[in-house]
């Protein structure tokens, strides 16, 4: 490796990592065959309110778990690009996480929130400005929890108002997609990090050439809240990520009894809006899905 770049002839010599980051839910981990892969870019696509940020917050805490418990024994960097960061929700989840894993913090004067580093990113240029600092932060971390997870929530927000739909802007935007994903993949490979990126959806607009219905991955169509949707940023961005998970929301609710064992369900009966995670494409996962709900304690999947 020279200047942080991997030579093509060395790609086949590298041993792929098998390390996974638990989602904090045993059923959801089963769907993902252990959780989120390290040394990889994982994208979570969903409309607002489906739970993609909730899952990312939960992953940020689960990173601190020991490797024997599905964690990475590390800290996380949360890059957020829209809305105020949900500190209140993070503290709520942190309290539950601390109660469930007191031994991690018993001999230290800290708490789970101390190991979730939050950075606002307000533009593409800003993201590129802080990339060198991220590289230095990961490489020179001397804390008891080295950085092991980077979350970018969300990538679509960075491009929402900066570019028009002109050929020149679309070309420039595609180039930036590959630069961003290339740098994140470089960090993931160099430091064996898990990288999670959220993306939004737009309503499907049918076109005369039929390209709007182009199939990418395991699902022919994507539906959420009764609408047919497509991931934002198009095919160029889809080619930049290793795995894509789609979270949808539908009418109705899930009622889950406490007899279905899951640490994230505290009441005897829990009721929540119905949500579903689908694996759209992944090099290491077959197509599958899992229903879940969001409780006060976190994401709680439902056994099929």
Swiss-Prot record:
**Is the keyword Transcription in the record?**
no
Please, which domain of life does this record's source organism belong to?
A: Eukaryota
The record's section on Gene3D superfamilies has: P-loop containing nucleotide triphosphate hydrolases
Q: Assembly and partners?
A: Interacts with RAD51C.
Give the record's keywords alphabetically: ATP-binding, DNA damage, DNA recombination, DNA repair, DNA-binding, Nucleotide-binding, Nucleus
Can you name one GO molecular function term for this protein? single-stranded DNA binding
Q: Which organism is it from?
A: Arabidopsis thaliana
What is this protein called in UniProt? DNA repair protein XRCC3 homolog
Q: What does this protein do?
A: Plays essential roles in DNA damage repair in both somatic and meiotic cells. It is important for postsynaptic events following pachytene in meiosis. It is also required for DNA cross-links repair and is involved in double strand breaks (DSBs) repair.
The similarity annotation says: Belongs to the RecA family. RAD51 subfamily.
Q: Which CDD domains match?
A: XRCC3
